[in-house]
UniProtKB/Swiss-Prot annotation:
Organism of this sequence: Mus musculus (Mouse)
Residues modified as Phosphoserine: 264
Compositionally skewed regions (Basic and acidic residues) per UniProt: 146-159
Phylogenetic placement of the source organism: Eukaryota, Metazoa, Chordata, Craniata, Vertebrata
Protein name, as recorded: Protein FAM228A
InterPro entries in UniProt: FAM228 (IPR040046)
Length: 299
């Protein structure tokens, strides 16, 4: 076997076989071609690898965005389906215990509306008087000796009268407040100050009497009742003092006569007593007006 192998090698590396081998230039050309092919293959592999890497990077970025979006959508659904209904139930449960009844709400609204002090304007107070004057016409004016226009009369009454503001509150009226209001109304009247004074030179004005509201009439009546009671008490005291001093003749108490102008029977004792009571009443009325101006209250 060894002999056969050596014989083959000798044949292969013999001089004749060596001549048949290619030249070295042709070998170098083949090497260049092989290197170019290898470079092209490597370049194609690198280009493909770069493309794969870029696509993988974009895929990973999109995957991260999709995950974040999925989390946001899940959170939104959880808030809409779980959190908001739970919060609504909790708030309804809490407010149901604190919610007042309908009667309580109506009572509170009524208290708020009634406890607000309001001022009534003069235009509202004179609206009925203007309608009454327009309905009556000129007969209403000539019956009281008036020939001027109703608009001028309304303006004069608005300037002359000063109504006190009152509040629409329940149980706000008391005897002292009524007395104070009556004193203010008597002070606001033009002919109320010198009604019982005989020595005054001013003439009473009665043009504004028809424009006064009904409340003033009731207050003036109470004031007249109070003055009559005071007059009766003063007269009884004067009679007792006159009996003690000897001004009145007789043992029994005499009945006080009227103060009318027709009573012209000369009685010296009664005249003196009347003069004294008139002076006392005048002083009392002056003190009443001063107290009404200063804001004092009489018991």
């Amino acid at each position: 076997m060894a002999d056969t192998k050596t014989s083959k090698c000798d044949e292969h590396f013999s001089v004749e076989k060596l001549k048949e081998w290619p030249e070295p230039e042709s070998v170098s050309l083949m090497e260049l071609l092989a290197r170019e092919d290898i470079d092209e293959a490597v370049h194609a592999v690198l280009f493909r690898e770069n493309y794969v890497v870029k696509r993988l990077d974009t895929y990973l970025q999109h995957l991260a965005v999709f995950k974040e979006r999925r989390k946001e959508m899940l959170h939104k659904k959880w808030v809409e389906n779980v959190v908001q209904p739970l919060q609504q139930r909790i708030t309804d449960k809490i407010t149901s215990y604190r919610r007042p009844g309908k009667n309580q709400v109506k009572y509170e609204h009524c208290l708020k509306q009634t406890n607000k002090p309001t001022k009534v304007s003069s235009s509202c107070l004179f609206q009925k008087q203007q309608e009454f004057r327009e309905a009556k016409g000129t007969s209403y004016q000539h019956g009281r000796g008036k020939t001027h226009d109703t608009q001028k009369e309304a303006k004069e009454t608005e300037k002359g009268l000063s109504f006190t503001p009152f509040s629409l509150r329940p149980h706000c009226s008391s005897p002292r407040e009524r007395q104070r209001a009556s004193a203010r109304l008597m002070q606001s009247k033009p002919g109320g100050r010198n009604r019982y004074k005989g020595a005054s030179s001013e003439k009473p004005v009665f043009t504004l009497k028809s424009h006064l509201p009904k409340e003033e009439k009731t207050v003036s009546r109470s004031q007249l009742v109070f003055e009559r009671q005071f007059r009766a008490s003063r007269l009884s005291q004067d009679i007792k003092e006159a009996e003690k001093k000897g001004l009145v003749v007789g043992t029994g108490p005499q009945r006080p006569r009227s103060w009318a102008a027709a009573d012209s029977v000369p009685r010296p004792s009664l005249v003196g007593r009347r003069v004294m009571t008139a002076e006392i009443l005048g002083e009392h009325l002056v003190s009443l007006h001063q107290a009404a101006r200063s804001g004092l209250q009489w018991p």
